[in-house]
């Protein structure tokens, strides 16, 4: 898959590649939502330090350069609301996401995933997958709403966040075949 743009602007939100300057705001936002995020995200379950934040931003920069992952801050009115990432997989991509508590229920993730799914297909991905713990109903509602199909369950990586069961549900959406060229 080709490299996506660094910024996407939509009505009501912006997706922007993470920058080192985002560190202080990201740190404050994650720490303000630790209970909410830590239930499902192992990286937030034991607290989130300035070093954790700096390491995340370093890793996102390296992964972007290698094409392994393209991570974006979700911004609403200029403020960080959460994150969405597009991870390269053989023949397709996986999309992961999270939001700060105060931004849940606004349709931001559904709209961000819609945008990035369309972009992934435009850039050559054959499929998009979304994985979530089988108990995380909110995360599962996104691919269900967007027409993805459950293709399997699989063991989650260890260690697990406190609310996780250890079983991930995997959803997939295939790129629609291109229409036949005119005159064929």
Model segments located where?
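Short, intrinsically disordered/low-complexity patches at protein termini
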Residues: 48-51, 60-62, 105, 162-164
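Acyl-donor (CoA/ACP) binding surface of acyl/acetyltransferases
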Residues: 1-25, 29-36, 71-184
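Generic recognition of well-ordered alpha-helical segments
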Residues: 55-59, 115-118
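A short helix-loop-beta-strand connector motif used in the catalytic cores of GNAT acetyltransferases and
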Residues: 44-47, 58-73
């Amino acid at each position: 898959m080709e490299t996506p743009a660094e910024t996407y602007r939509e009505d009501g939100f912006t997706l922007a590649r993470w920058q080192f300057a985002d560190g202080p705001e990201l740190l404050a936002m994650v720490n303000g939502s630790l209970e909410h995020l830590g239930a499902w995200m192992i990286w937030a379950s034991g607290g989130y330090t300035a070093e954790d934040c700096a390491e995340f931003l370093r890793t996102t920069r390296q992964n972007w350069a290698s094409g392994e992952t393209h991570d974006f801050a979700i911004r609403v009115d200029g403020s960080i609301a959460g994150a969405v990432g597009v991870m390269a997989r053989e023949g397709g991509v996986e999309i992961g996401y999270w939001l700060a508590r105060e931004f849940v229920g606004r349709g931001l993730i559904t709209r961000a995933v819609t945008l990035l799914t369309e972009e992934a297909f435009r850039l050559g991905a054959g499929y998009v997958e979304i994985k979530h713990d089988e108990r995380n109903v909110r995360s599962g509602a996104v691919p269900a709403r967007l027409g993805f199909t459950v293709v399997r369950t699989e063991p989650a990586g260890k260690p697990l966040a406190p609310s996780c069961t250890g079983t991930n549900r995997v959803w997939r959406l295939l790129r629609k075949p291109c229409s036949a060229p005119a005159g064929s």
